[in-house]
Amino acid sequence: MVVSDVAGSQSRYDAVLVGAGIMSATLAALLHELDPELSLLMVERLQAPGLESSAAENNAGTGHAANCELNYTPLQPDGSVATAKALAINTAFERSLEFWASLTEKGKLLPQQFLHLVPHISVVFGDADLAFLHQRFQQLSALPAFASMQWSTDVAELAEWMPLVMEGRANAESVAATCIKRGTDVDFGLLTGAYVKSLQASGALELSCGCEVVHLHRLGKHQWNLDLKHSSGSRSVQTPFVFLGAGGGALPLLQRSGIPEAAAYAGFPVSGQWLVCSEPGLTARHHAKVYGKAKVGAPPMSVPHLDSRWIDGCRSLLFGPYAGFSSKFLKQGSRLDLLRSVRRSNFRSMLEVGFKNFDLVTYLLSELQQSEKDRFETLKQFLPNAQLNDWKLSVAGQRVQIIKRTAEGGRLQMGTEVVSAQDGSLAALLGASPGASTAVTVMLEVLQRCWSERMASESWQQRLRKLLPSYGHDPNSEPLLLTQMRIRSNKLLNFT
């Protein structure tokens, strides 16, 4: 991977992407496929792409398709579960698979390097949660997107699906699970690197690592200047389009841009930790992503799950994440990040969210006070036979949830949101979960907002339909199209 020397680089680009994570890399890949002549600059403060939230050990969940994440189907007052969010996330992930399949067909990606088939399982304990999971199963399995979902309370079958979870469990305990065999684990750090390497080979992308944006300001309509600081010197670059895809670092940059749209936003940082096992005798026996049910008041990134996960090509088990609080906006950020983000325009919203979500703040602080024994006891609820010596504590990535000023006051949002300038010359991605798995869909939204004329052109429309054969259609209302999408993706991505 080539990292440019700032002093010898050009000064004008068609697009500058700040942050070399999965979002910026996906946007760069889409832009290059739509117009190979575009010149792109990617700026990263760390020494290589994909080291912050996109890295496998930092990502709260990989391969999100709403197959097993129970927080995407909340229980409703009438006893049913809401399915709209699960359907939207599943469709978004299918679109990501569709894009990766197209780049694989072109020889630009090797899916075996970052993509692995892993069953997705939801598991619950106790009669009340069994009733919830069965209701979820009945509703989702009736939809084409989740038609392959299986349900079981049979101990022998559950032991086949998740042997480590069932071993040592009391026979009297009520257990139920659902399973979708066509699930995945995705190493978004490796995928980010693959995107960047391919784009560099084409000559379309210049990557500048160890480089920070110290200032950005408008020069005029559709014109931005960015002042960059690098170990080898400083320079200024100009561009008609800026994307702020720097994870938790996007909010401070958005605020520095001065666009009026930024005034409505603040950030609520959430940290996390994993228990990680690399013992081959255990990693070989657990081949699934097993998601449980979050505690009442817990944030989405704290949904307990036991993950088969490939980290830099090596198979591991991750359990957690254990939530916590840190004032940093990035794992490799500053403890002053939260304080520095406070503005007159967002201070009231931050206070209102603090009061409205006091239980959440209390929960996060209590998680911080957990001892090694406390964390291990939580693990044993999932793995009754777990041995402490097989697991080590690892710090997960930092998430910055959105605080947004609304007519009803400050509101805490747990998803992601694209914030863009009125003229489309700048866009930022704020928030977290489901994040990386929906990158293609989210970056298409950025293109629709900020490159609307080009997106409406016949040349871009033709290229989009080749890249994404389902583009412009809703697979959830066209079951045959969904089947065709999956057959194509399965074939090109070697899902066997």
From Swiss-Prot:
Gene: mqo
Species whose genome carries this gene: Prochlorococcus marinus (strain MIT 9313)
HAMAP family: MQO
Cofactors (names): FAD
NCBIfam families for the chain: mal_quin_oxido, PRK05257.2-1, PRK05257.2-3, PRK05257.3-2
Alphabetical UniProt keywords: FAD, Flavoprotein, Oxidoreductase, Tricarboxylic acid cycle
SUPFAM superfamilies cross-referenced by the UniProt entry: FAD/NAD(P)-binding domain
Pfam families hit by this protein: Mqo
PANTHER family for this protein: L-2-HYDROXYGLUTARATE DEHYDROGENASE, MITOCHONDRIAL
Descriptive protein name: Probable malate:quinone oxidoreductase
Pathway: Carbohydrate metabolism; tricarboxylic acid cycle; oxaloacetate from (S)-malate (quinone route): step 1/1
Keyword set includes Ubl conjugation: no
Oxidoreductase listed as a keyword: yes
Top-level taxon of the source organism: Bacteria
GO terms for MF: 2-hydroxyglutarate dehydrogenase activity; L-malate dehydrogenase (quinone) activity
Catalyzed reactions: (S)-malate + a quinone = a quinol + oxaloacetate
Family (UniProt): Belongs to the MQO family.
Classification via InterPro entries: FAD/NAD-bd_sf (IPR036188), MQO (IPR006231)
One BP annotation, GO: tricarboxylic acid cycle
Class of enzymatic activity (EC top level): oxidoreductase
Enzyme Commission designation: 1.1.5.4
